[in-house]
Amino acid sequence: MTNKNTSKDMHKNAPKGHNPGQPEPLSGSKKVKNRNHTRQKHNSSHDM
């Protein structure tokens, strides 16, 4: 149980720091987060 958790954490951390654009799940999450951030910033500017 502990080994599996560590392995998963290490695996996620490895691709994140090594290739922040290679993993599909990470890339998708990052893309959506980035897009949301830009949209929110744009919206805020417009609201002001």
Curated annotation (Swiss-Prot):
Compartments, record wording: Spore core
Region (Disordered) location: 1-48
Task: Quote the biased-composition stretches of kind Basic and acidic residues, using this chain's numbering.
Answer: 1-12
| The entry's keywords | Sporulation
GO process annotations (BP): asexual sporulation; sporulation resulting in formation of a cellular spore
Q: Name one Pfam family in it.
A: SspP
What upregulates this protein?
A: Expressed only in the forespore compartment of sporulating cells. Expression is sigma G-dependent.
To which protein family does this belong? Belongs to the SspP family.
The record's listing under NCBIfam families reads: PRK09399.1
HAMAP family linked: SspP (MF_00666)
Protein's name according to its UniProt entry: Small, acid-soluble spore protein P
**Organism whose genome encodes this protein:** Bacillus subtilis (strain 168)
| GN (gene name) | sspP
